[in-house]
């Protein structure tokens, strides 16, 4: 059988017609220097600020410095395998993280990858980690309470949904414990919580996760962790990843509580990156834009207007002080950005006042309008009582011959301090807080020995639960105080059954 030339030419023509040449154009650069989590790359002339790039070993990086001859890239992973001369590809994507309901109950790193060993997170939705904060007209003033379950905070320094409240203090003063209690108290409150651990020890993060799991709080919490062993770029990105996950819920009309533990370590990581990228250092060697680093993060916490779905993000950023110095650079920056601060003092902590909140230096600038009416009424004089007690306490150490009014103030102050103490991981419903503070401010505790106050409190709650549940339910439902005579009858009824210790 002979093959005809025409057949061959027809076959060749068909093959040529069917041939599709898929040309893939890639923007590729070359690593000219690498080390300490930073790579300088030549040849990525069209790279965008904040764009993700991919190294030849699959590790991702983020473009930070766009210079004339090279691009400064922070490496988001191990950099020991990256060598000079390696190829770097542009991805054309800005840094994004996965978002959505599927993340609830999971522990992820700042790139949104799971680190809890429970398999992949099945969500296709992502959001860019840098996005503009809601504008002025998209917001509404803070008016709904966020109950932390901590008497000292809910009474003296109330927090509203959509507020930014700084928690500031030295190391080992109970900052994390305050935030964990606030998360535990959001059970059945229709709140989603995001806990962002920045530069914490892995064992500490594990402890926090176990506490949340034990109390059933992991059912509504996302944990984002960039531990101390992670590269600095991941510590810098962690808070932005956390707030991005929270924004997805806020824009869908939900309420979110975000805890940043803590921003001092993020600022230190950002300082490290900036110095390695050869940006000019400023005060305490921080770069000039360290204020913007925190302001653009915390401005994304907001209470949205009804037209935008009325969702909210409440932010509890932490800042660690050195020897109680709240006038240092990062503390003053964050104090000026937030709507108030809760100052935890080591002297109080070691003297047994826990939570160790200094009522004089702590303030909530917008939370007062979010307090329920009942709490407003019973906590009105508390701050003054405490302040005058602290003043007189120092004075009373020198002289014993005190007049009756001064002695009464000291007695009331000692009982106030005792009532505001609270055990770890035992947040208290707001109606019970109101009940004990009512008894305190109306003078029903003045004849109870200070040593018996904690026992009195516990037995009082049990008595109310058994005999006057209607009073507690009334406060919880309406937010108002019951009639004075009803409350008076309940307290006096309990006091008749209470036996002080000898």
From Swiss-Prot:
<dbReference type="InterPro" id="IPR004100">
    <property type="entry name" value="ATPase_F1/V1/A1_a/bsu_N"/>
</dbReference>
<keyword id="KW-0066">ATP synthesis</keyword>
<feature type="site" description="Required for activity">
    <location>
        <position position="362"/>
    </location>
</feature>
<dbReference type="GO" id="GO:0015986">
    <property type="term" value="P:proton motive force-driven ATP synthesis"/>
</dbReference>
<dbReference type="GO" id="GO:0043531">
    <property type="term" value="F:ADP binding"/>
</dbReference>
<dbReference type="InterPro" id="IPR020003">
    <property type="entry name" value="ATPase_a/bsu_AS"/>
</dbReference>
<comment type="function">
    <text>Produces ATP from ADP in the presence of a proton gradient across the membrane. The alpha chain is a regulatory subunit.</text>
</comment>
<keyword id="KW-1003">Cell membrane</keyword>
<dbReference type="GO" id="GO:0005524">
    <property type="term" value="F:ATP binding"/>
</dbReference>
<comment type="subunit">
    <text>F-type ATPases have 2 components, CF(1) - the catalytic core - and CF(0) - the membrane proton channel. CF(1) has five subunits: alpha(3), beta(3), gamma(1), delta(1), epsilon(1). CF(0) has three main subunits: a(1), b(2) and c(9-12). The alpha and beta chains form an alternating ring which encloses part of the gamma chain. CF(1) is attached to CF(0) by a central stalk formed by the gamma and epsilon chains, while a peripheral stalk is formed by the delta and b chains. The F(1)F(0) complex interacts with SpoIIIJ and YqjG; YqgA is found in the same complex.</text>
</comment>
<dbReference type="Pfam" id="PF02874">
    <property type="entry name" value="ATP-synt_ab_N"/>
</dbReference>
<keyword id="KW-0813">Transport</keyword>
<keyword id="KW-0472">Membrane</keyword>
<keyword id="KW-0406">Ion transport</keyword>
<dbReference type="InterPro" id="IPR000194">
    <property type="entry name" value="ATPase_F1/V1/A1_a/bsu_nucl-bd"/>
</dbReference>
<dbReference type="InterPro" id="IPR000793">
    <property type="entry name" value="ATP_synth_asu_C"/>
</dbReference>
<feature type="binding site">
    <location>
        <begin position="169"/>
        <end position="176"/>
    </location>
    <ligand>
        <name>ATP</name>
    </ligand>
</feature>
<dbReference type="GO" id="GO:0005886">
    <property type="term" value="C:plasma membrane"/>
</dbReference>
<protein>
    <recommendedName>
        <fullName>ATP synthase subunit alpha</fullName>
        <ecNumber>7.1.2.2</ecNumber>
    </recommendedName>
</protein>
<dbReference type="InterPro" id="IPR038376">
    <property type="entry name" value="ATP_synth_asu_C_sf"/>
</dbReference>
<keyword id="KW-0067">ATP-binding</keyword>
<dbReference type="GO" id="GO:0045121">
    <property type="term" value="C:membrane raft"/>
</dbReference>
<dbReference type="GO" id="GO:0045259">
    <property type="term" value="C:proton-transporting ATP synthase complex"/>
</dbReference>
<dbReference type="InterPro" id="IPR033732">
    <property type="entry name" value="ATP_synth_F1_a_nt-bd_dom"/>
</dbReference>
<keyword id="KW-1278">Translocase</keyword>
<comment type="similarity">
    <text>Belongs to the ATPase alpha/beta chains family.</text>
</comment>
<dbReference type="Pfam" id="PF00006">
    <property type="entry name" value="ATP-synt_ab"/>
</dbReference>
<dbReference type="InterPro" id="IPR023366">
    <property type="entry name" value="ATP_synth_asu-like_sf"/>
</dbReference>
<keyword id="KW-0375">Hydrogen ion transport</keyword>
<keyword id="KW-0139">CF(1)</keyword>
<dbReference type="InterPro" id="IPR036121">
    <property type="entry name" value="ATPase_F1/V1/A1_a/bsu_N_sf"/>
</dbReference>
<dbReference type="GO" id="GO:0046933">
    <property type="term" value="F:proton-transporting ATP synthase activity, rotational mechanism"/>
</dbReference>
<dbReference type="Pfam" id="PF00306">
    <property type="entry name" value="ATP-synt_ab_C"/>
</dbReference>
<dbReference type="InterPro" id="IPR005294">
    <property type="entry name" value="ATP_synth_F1_asu"/>
</dbReference>
<dbReference type="InterPro" id="IPR027417">
    <property type="entry name" value="P-loop_NTPase"/>
</dbReference>
<keyword id="KW-0547">Nucleotide-binding</keyword>
